[in-house]
Curated annotation (Swiss-Prot):
Note: Platelet activation apparently involves disruption of the macromolecular complex of GP-Ib with the platelet glycoprotein IX (GP-IX) and dissociation of GP-Ib from the actin-binding protein.
Regions that span the bilayer: 148-172
LRR repeat extents: 60-83
Role noted for this protein: Gp-Ib, a surface membrane protein of platelets, participates in the formation of platelet plugs by binding to von Willebrand factor, which is already bound to the subendothelium.
Signal peptide coordinates: 1-25
Topological domain ranges for the Extracellular compartment: 27-147
Disease implication from the record: Bernard-Soulier syndrome: A coagulation disorder characterized by a prolonged bleeding time, unusually large platelets, thrombocytopenia, and impaired prothrombin consumption.
Residue stretches making up the LRRNT domain: 27-55
Protein name: Platelet glycoprotein Ib beta chain
Subcellular localization(s) per the UniProt record: Membrane
């Protein structure tokens, strides 16, 4: 008779036990089933996309959102990931897509990603993302604050180099003038001493 309550208690504990993946491991507003994370058609953008997914994710669905790019390292942080559904997003093919392009290049099969086409910029519109060269993506990126900062630093160094070169030229000119003056003074002194030497030589001979 005692096994009845114990069996009911065991069944209750089994029903109340947490699933194989804790609810906290599934980022909002996605839904999770086992190692599949479905974030498709939820209007996600760069700003609203979850910053991390469960590390054991094997399949990730991001189809049908408003994603123009993915944060760097987002997919690389999922070592068990086998498939990422990325279609039906307005991808902007510039330097922000370099990490995604590198991740796609490392996939053994590119067939699932042949529908990833660039929506912008105009020069790359309609191109297939997996087959773009990295240089094409970087060239499509407008210079940002870091680029302008690097350019300003290079211009400052160039200006300092030109200033040093100008100072060196002025210093060399100054040295040449000083040498010329010294030679002129030496020649003048020599011209003054030559008659005296000749006169002394004449008196000595007499």
């Amino acid at each position: 008779m005692g096994s009845g309550p114990r069996g009911a208690l065991s069944l209750l504990l089994l029903l109340l036990a947490p699933p194989s993946r804790p609810a906290a491991g599934c980022p909002a507003p996605c839904s999770c089933a086992g190692t599949l994370v479905d974030c498709g058609r939820r209007g996600l953008t760069w700003a609203s996309l979850p910053t991390a997914f469960p590390v054991d994710t094997t399949e990730l669905v991001l189809t049908g959102n408003n994603l123009t790019a993915l944060p760097p390292g987002l997919l690389d942080a999922l070592p068990a990931l086998r498939t990422a559904h990325l279609g039906a997003n307005p991808w902007r093919c510039d330097c922000r897509l370099v990490p995604l392009r590198a991740w796609l290049a490392g996939r053994p099969e590119r067939a699932p990603y042949r529908d990833l086409r660039c929506v912008a910029p105009p020069a790359l519109r309609g191109r297939l993302l997996p087959y773009l060269a990295e240089d094409e993506l970087r060239a499509a990126c407008a210079p940002g604050p870091l680029c302008w900062g690097a350019l300003a630093a290079q211009l400052a160094l160039l200006g300092l180099g030109l200033l040093h070169a100008l100072l060196l030229v002025l210093l060399l000119c100054r040295l040449r003038r000083l040498r010329a003056r010294a030679r002129a003074r030496a020649a003048a002194r020599l011209s003054l001493t030559d008659p005296l030497v000749a006169e002394r030589a004449g008196t000595d001979e007499s």
